Amino acid sequence: MSQLPLELGLSFNGGDILFQLLAMLVLLALLKKFALGPLLNIMKQREDHIAGEITSAEERNKEAQKLIEEQRVLLKEAKQESQSLIENAKKLGEKQKEDIIQAARAESERLKEAARTEIVKEKEQAVSALREQVASLSVLIASKVIEKELDEQAQEQLIQDYLKEVGESR
């Protein structure tokens, strides 16, 4: 096997290989100390920063979800309250409508009763006025028939008798 590199025109120098191996190890040690350490620290910091951002984002997301849920609850309560207010307003409107109708009916009945009372009163006044006119005419006719003037007491008695007759005939 030692003949193979010579046939190809390659020669190996053990010292060069050893020196290059040693230089490579020193270079790797220096890279590890001066480049890899800070690079790993930067990567660790970046990893920590990203993890912190993810955690922060998750917390903000949880808080946002919590706020959304609170808003849903508040919206649901507001809808229920508005529905309750609408129902109460409808009930109040119906009650006021019924109260107004009832008051209008009562006022109508009161006006009817007042009109009936007024009619009865006017009828009584008309009957009374008619009786007085009839009495006056009766006295006038009677006085012409008798051809004498009745005194006031006799006239009153005659009127009362006539009114009794008229009242009985009704």
From Swiss-Prot:
GO MF, one example: proton-transporting ATPase activity, rotational mechanism
Membrane topology qualifier: Single-pass membrane protein
Subcellular compartments: Cell membrane
Transmembrane annotation, as ranges: 20-42
A family per Pfam: ATP-synt_B
Keywords per UniProt: ATP synthesis, Cell membrane, CF(0), Hydrogen ion transport, Ion transport, Membrane, Transmembrane, Transmembrane helix, Transport
Principal subcellular localization: membrane
One annotated Gene Ontology cellular component of this protein: proton-transporting ATP synthase complex
Record note on quaternary structure: F-type ATPases have 2 components, F(1) - the catalytic core - and F(0) - the membrane proton channel. F(1) has five subunits: alpha(3), beta(3), gamma(1), delta(1), epsilon(1). F(0) has three main subunits: a(1), b(2) and c(10-14). The alpha and beta chains form an alternating ring which encloses part of the gamma chain. F(1) is attached to F(0) by a central stalk formed by the gamma and epsilon chains, while a peripheral stalk is formed by the delta and b chains.
PANTHER family: ATP SYNTHASE SUBUNIT B, ATP SYNTHASE SUBUNIT B', CHLOROPLASTIC
Similarity section: Belongs to the ATPase B chain family.
Cited function: F(1)F(0) ATP synthase produces ATP from ADP in the presence of a proton or sodium gradient. F-type ATPases consist of two structural domains, F(1) containing the extramembraneous catalytic core and F(0) containing the membrane proton channel, linked together by a central stalk and a peripheral stalk. During catalysis, ATP synthesis in the catalytic domain of F(1) is coupled via a rotary mechanism of the central stalk subunits to proton translocation. Component of the F(0) channel, it forms part of the peripheral stalk, linking F(1) to F(0).
Protein name: ATP synthase subunit b
Source organism per UniProt: Bacillus velezensis (strain DSM 23117 / BGSC 10A6 / LMG 26770 / FZB42) (Bacillus amyloliquefaciens subsp. plantarum)
Gene: atpF
